[in-house]
Swiss-Prot record:
Species assigned in the record: Nostoc punctiforme (strain ATCC 29133 / PCC 73102)
Functional note: F(1)F(0) ATP synthase produces ATP from ADP in the presence of a proton or sodium gradient. F-type ATPases consist of two structural domains, F(1) containing the extramembraneous catalytic core and F(0) containing the membrane proton channel, linked together by a central stalk and a peripheral stalk. During catalysis, ATP synthesis in the catalytic domain of F(1) is coupled via a rotary mechanism of the central stalk subunits to proton translocation. Component of the F(0) channel, it forms part of the peripheral stalk, linking F(1) to F(0).
Quaternary data: F-type ATPases have 2 components, F(1) - the catalytic core - and F(0) - the membrane proton channel. F(1) has five subunits: alpha(3), beta(3), gamma(1), delta(1), epsilon(1). F(0) has four main subunits: a(1), b(1), b'(1) and c(10-14). The alpha and beta chains form an alternating ring which encloses part of the gamma chain. F(1) is attached to F(0) by a central stalk formed by the gamma and epsilon chains, while a peripheral stalk is formed by the delta, b and b' chains.
Pfam families (alphabetical): ATP-synt_B
Compartments in which it is found: Cellular thylakoid membrane
One annotated Gene Ontology cellular component of this protein: plasma membrane-derived thylakoid membrane
Name of protein: ATP synthase subunit b
Length: 190
């Protein structure tokens, strides 16, 4: 019940007492004149005294409770502020760590990409060199085979020519000259 409720209760009680006293005064007894307009000063002093006496406890209790609630709310707010500051500093620290980790990962990715690029270039150079060597070996093999075929062909043609000449017969002076040359090649003297 608030101050207004107390005030209204006191006013209603004062009105009830006033009507009883007015009846008592009309019957010839002692009575208080509680008519506010007739006895303003006395009634106001009594009313203020009653309000002060009874209202002081209620008002002080209300004010103490209010003060206690405000102090509790302030303490809770300060506690939440400290928690928020702590959480903020932790979040900022985590942000710094996350940024450092992200930078480290980015740097690592750049280094890995560079290493992969260098490895690919080195492998490509090796592949080109291997292809050159393979091509050169194939070319040498083909050249040697062609030369061997040509030698075989020349030898075959030479043998065919010699056979045809032998079949046709060799003239005596050509035969003598061939024998002399063969002996000279073998290291003999004629």
């Amino acid at each position: 019940m608030g101050i207004m409720g107390t005030f209204l209760l006191l006013a209603a009680e004062a009105n009830a007492v006033h009507s009883e006293l007015a009846e008592g005064a009309a019957e010839g007894g002692f009575g208080l004149n509680l008519d506010i307009f007739e006895t303003n000063l006395i009634n106001l002093a009594i009313l203020v005294g009653i309000l002060f006496y009874f209202g002081r406890k209620v008002l002080s209790n209300i004010l103490n409770e209010r003060q206690s609630n405000i102090a509790t709310a302030i303490q809770e707010a300060e506690g939440r502020l400290k928690e928020a500051k702590t959480a903020l500093s932790q979040a900022q620290e985590q942000l710094k760590q996350s940024q450092a980790e992200a930078e480290r990962i980015r740097q690592s990715a750049v280094e890995n990409a560079q290493k992969a690029k260098e490895a690919l270039l080195a492998k490509a150079v090796q592949d080109v060199e291997r292809l050159k060597q393979t091509a050169a070996a194939d070319l040498n093999t083909e050249t040697e085979r062609a030369i061997a075929q040509l030698r075989q062909r020349v030898a075959t043609l030479a043998l065919q020519k010699v056979e045809s000449q032998l079949k046709g017969g060799i003239a005596d002076d050509a035969q003598q000259s061939l024998i002399d040359r063969s002996i000279a090649q073998l290291g003999g003297n004629v």
